[in-house]
Amino acid sequence: MLVQLGAAVAVLAVTAGVGPTGRFDVPVNGFAAATTVLREGSPESVGLDPAPIEAAKATIAGSPLFPGAVTLLAHDGVIVDRTATGKAVRYADATTELPAEQQVPMRVDTIFDVASVTKLFTSIAVLGLVEDGKVDIEKPVSTYLPEFGVNGKATITVKHLLTHTSGLEPFIPLWRDYPDKAARIKAVMDHAPSAPPGSVYTYSDLNLITLGVLVERQRGESLDSVVTKRITTPLGLTDTGYNPPASKRDRIAATEYQTTPARGMVRGEVHDENAWSLGGVAGHAGVFSTAEDLAVLGQTILNGGTYRGKRILREATVREMLTNHNAAYPGNAHGLGFELDQRWYMGGLAGPRTAGHTGFTGTSLVLDPASRSIAVLLTNRVHPVRTNGSINSAREALASGLARALAVRPRQGPTAWYTATGGATLLTGPLRSTGPVSVSFAAFVDTDAGDSLVVEFEDGGEWRALPLRVSGPGAPEQEVSGLSGSGHRSWWTVHAIGPVGAPVTVRWRYVTDSRYSGRGVTLDRITVTDSRRILLDGEKQPHLIRPLGWGPKTR
C-alpha cells in the first residue's frame, strides 16, 4: 500500500485550491480542477508578461548547443506559447551537414526520443500496480521478482528503486557485454549494489530497468502495452509510445550518429544503447513523445491524476509522486518517480513542490503546482554527437522565463524595484543622520542557494554589511547577513540598524555566483530613518535612489 502522507504534502491535500491567475507571489494549494483541459491562449490572457517568455525563447533559438528545439509553456490550463526553432535533422553523419534542401525543419509537433523522461511513464505504471493492490512499495523487490534478491539486494524495496536510493550504480553496458535480451535482464537481476540500500542517493538506470521488468511480471504483458493501455490511450497521447511506426518517421528528430555500436544516424529508434538492446522498450528509456503530449501528461498530474474525465492515478497517489521521500539526501529531493526542487533545470520555478525530469537526449519537463504552470523543452542536443555539451542553461532559461512572466505585485504603490542580474545595486545618496540609522524594506526573494541580497553602508570608503532581521513566511529565524532562498513565494519584512554618524550611504546589492539563478529579487517600501526623522521614503522619493541593474516594475 502507499506510504502515509507526511506534513510536507499537507498543502496538497485540498483539491482545486483557488488563487489568482498569473501570480508568482500567491502560491496555490491543492490540485487544479479535475475538469481543466489545456487550451490555446496568449500570455496576456492569463495575466502573464510576454517579455520574459520572448527573452527565454531568444536564448534557446540562439543556442549553439543543439540543432533545434520545441518549447511549450502553459499556465492555469492555457498553452501560452509553443515554438519550434532550428532543425530536426541537420547532419548526415558525425561532422557533415546535409545540403540545406535536405535538412528537416523543426515543427511544433516534432516527435522526440525523450530518453529518461521515460522514467515517469514507468513510475506511473508501477503506482498503478500499487493502486490495484498488486505491489507494496515498502516491500522488497524480490517479493515480486525473486531472482532480484541476490548479491546484497534482498532488502532493496520498490520505494528504493523509485527514489534512486537502492545503492545500485548508474549504468552497466548491457548492450556490449551480454548477447541477448534475456542475458541482459539477468545481468541486471544479478548485479550487486555498490552501496547498502537506503544509504546513498545514486541516480541509476538499473532501478528503472528493474521496475519495467516488475511491471511486465505483475501485469502479464509487455511494458509498452501497459503504458499504452493505462496512460497514453486514456490521455489521448497519440504521438507517445515506444518504437514509433515508420509512418511517423518524417516527424521524428534525429539523435546521434553512432559508430559503436554501428547504428549510423539514429532516427526513429531509441538512442540509449541499453534500451535499444532490449528491443526499444525499457523502464529507463525508450519513449518518444511531443511537447503537447508531455504537456497533457503534466496537466494530468496538476489535475491530481485525471484529464478529460479519464483518471490514470488517484489524487493520493499523485501526492506521493510530489512528496519528497529523500529528505536524508539534501539536494536530491525525489518523489515517487518525479525529481523535485532541482534549480539546475527548473530555474525560477524551483520550489519544494516543483516536479520534473530530464532526458539525456536534451529533453525536460517541469511542473509547478504552486502556480499551475508547465514548461516543456525538447531538443536534439545529441545530434550529431553526444559531446555537444550540457543544455542546462537553456533548460533553466525557459523555466525562469515562465517564472518571471508570472507577477509579483508591489507591496505598496504602483511599482517596486526588481533585478535578476548579479552585481545589481541600489544606492542611496548621502543621508545626514543625527544618530543610529534604521533601514527597513520589503523583499521578495527567489534565489539560488549560493546567491544573496546584502545591505551595506559606506564606512570610510569601505562597504560593510548590515545584519538583517527578517519576518514573514519562510523567513530565516535568526539574524542574517544576506537574504537568500526560494519556495516560500512570499514578501518578507526586513529591518537593519546602521551606524551612528553623518552622512550615511546605504546600498542593496544582489550577489550571485556563476551557477544557477532564481526568479530574482524585488524590493519595496524602502525607508531609512534615524531617531528624529525619516531620511528616505522610497515611495515618495524614488529619485533619491540610484539603480544600477535594477528597474521599476509593476509586476
Predicted regions and their residues:
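Short, surface-exposed loop or secondary-structure junction motifs
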Residues: 29-31, 83, 88-90, 94, ...
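Active-site SXXK
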Residues: 53-60, 71, 77, 110-139, ...
